[in-house]
């Protein structure tokens, strides 16, 4: 359950659905968890209700979970920090967190379960960490096919802890492990981050397809060809094919493309059915739709490396208002034939 049977004190930064779910899991299996929300009013509501009524209604907070809005108080005397803030806030929170931590202790364990790219720079999150904290910092990326509601309820779950430092990867795997939660380890940080971000784009694509009632054949084709695109993109950035075929790649892709708990898939469904601008649909969903930010970042990177990523291109065109879902389908089907196994 814990590192050498010793409970840890863990700060979870970000009290949305995913951060709350991970905090609930960690505290339920014996760790002391301090969940941070940057908004004092939200933090007070969470602490008084003892559950996240907005995102995880009916799942009570364990006694070992406390909610804070003061970052310095949250980080006091912790063994480890898990960041689960939106990608656009990642750098700012990282800077503040590290400044506080370095004032109190020389070493701490760092991981994040945020998926996506930094919107302003199109950088992957590990690149931000290396820019801000140095190339030698140890960290882990936690990713895989997961829905917050199911993790919070204690349903069986498997994820990946990726780090170039095997001990760091194992630290987080051990911290999460219990009878209902299995965390595998590996070293391909780039591949794990790409899988976690790219699958959100494909979830939007399958949502658009299903919103147009194009059928199960079309959905399966999008998932299969989306997998090829993800591998092609990963090749350009140094990811391993084996990673793309694992939990953080194929596993997460299938989950988010086929279940309506995925807000990216729901976004695609609503966009196709309503024919409204993307911004209006995002506002109605009321949560961050990471795939919208991811597709803009991937488009910039794809243009830089001259990558052929046709599904991504059409999702991008729809989101920025350059095409409709119906037009995008026609463009994809008009493409010249090619070998199915041509990844480059």
From Swiss-Prot:
Positions annotated to bind sn-glycerol 3-phosphate: 115, 144, 146, 199, 252, 262-264
Subcellular location: Cytoplasm
Record's function text: Catalyzes the reduction of the glycolytic intermediate dihydroxyacetone phosphate (DHAP) to sn-glycerol 3-phosphate (G3P), the key precursor for phospholipid synthesis.
Record-listed NADPH binding positions: 18, 38, 115, 148, 263, 288, 290
GO biological process terms on file: carbohydrate metabolic process; glycerol-3-phosphate biosynthetic process; glycerol-3-phosphate catabolic process; glycerophospholipid biosynthetic process
Any one GO cellular component localisation term in the record: cytosol
First-level EC class: oxidoreductase
Species, as recorded: Hydrogenovibrio crunogenus (strain DSM 25203 / XCL-2) (Thiomicrospira crunogena)
PROSITE patterns named in the record: NAD_G3PDH
Gene name as annotated: gpsA
Pathway: Membrane lipid metabolism; glycerophospholipid metabolism
EC number assigned by the record: 1.1.1.94
The keyword Nucleotide-binding appears for this protein: yes
Full protein name: Glycerol-3-phosphate dehydrogenase [NAD(P)+]
Record key words, sorted: Cytoplasm, Lipid biosynthesis, Lipid metabolism, NAD, NADP, Nucleotide-binding, Oxidoreductase, Phospholipid biosynthesis, Phospholipid metabolism
Domain of life of the source: Bacteria
InterPro entries the record matches: 6-PGluconate_DH-like_C_sf, 6PGD_dom2, G3P_DH_NAD-dep, G3P_DH_NAD-dep_C, G3P_DH_NAD-dep_N, NAD(P)-bd_dom_sf
Chief place where the protein resides: cytoplasm
């Amino acid at each position: 359950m814990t590192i050498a049977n010793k409970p840890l004190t863990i700060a979870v930064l970000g009290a949305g659905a995913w951060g709350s779910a991970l905090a609930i899991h960690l505290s339920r299996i014996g760790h002391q968890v301090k969940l941070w929300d940057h908004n004092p009013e939200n933090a007070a509501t969470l602490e008084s209700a003892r559950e996240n009524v907005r995102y995880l209604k009916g799942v009570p907070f364990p006694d070992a979970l406390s909610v804070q809005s003061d970052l310095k108080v949250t980080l006091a005397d912790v063994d480890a920090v898990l960041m689960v803030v939106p990608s656009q806030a990642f750098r700012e929170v990282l800077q503040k967190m590290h400044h506080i931590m370095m004032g109190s202790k020389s070493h701490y364990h760092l991981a994040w379960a945020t998926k996506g790219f930094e919107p302003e720079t199109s950088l992957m999150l590990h690149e931000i960490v290396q820019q801000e904290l140095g190339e030698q910092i140890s960290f882990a990326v936690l990713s895989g096919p997961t829905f917050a509601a199911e993790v919070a309820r204690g349903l069986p779950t498997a994820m990946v802890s990726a780090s170039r430092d095997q001990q760091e990867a194992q630290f987080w795997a051990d911290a999460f492990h219990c009878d209902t939660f299995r965390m595998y380890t590996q070293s391909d940080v780039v591949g794990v981050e790409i899988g976690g971000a790219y699958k959100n784009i494909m979830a939007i694509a399958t949502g658009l397809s299903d919103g147009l009632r194009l059928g199960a054949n079309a959905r399966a084709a999008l998932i299969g060809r989306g997998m090829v695109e993800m591998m092609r993109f990963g090749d350009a950035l140094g990811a391993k094919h084996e990673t793309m075929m694992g939990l953080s790649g194929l596993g997460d892709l299938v989950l988010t493309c086929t279940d309506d708990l995925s807000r990216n898939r729901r976004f695609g469904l609503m966009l196709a059915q309503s024919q409204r601008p993307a911004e209006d649909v995002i506002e109605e969903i009321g949560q961050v739709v990471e795939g919208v930010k991811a597709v803009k970042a991937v488009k910039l990177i794809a243009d830089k490396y001259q990558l052929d990523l046709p599904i991504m291109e059409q999702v991008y065109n729809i989101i920025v208002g350059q095409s409709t879902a119906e037009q995008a389908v026609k463009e994809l089907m008009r493409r010249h034939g090619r070998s199915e196994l041509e990844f480059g």
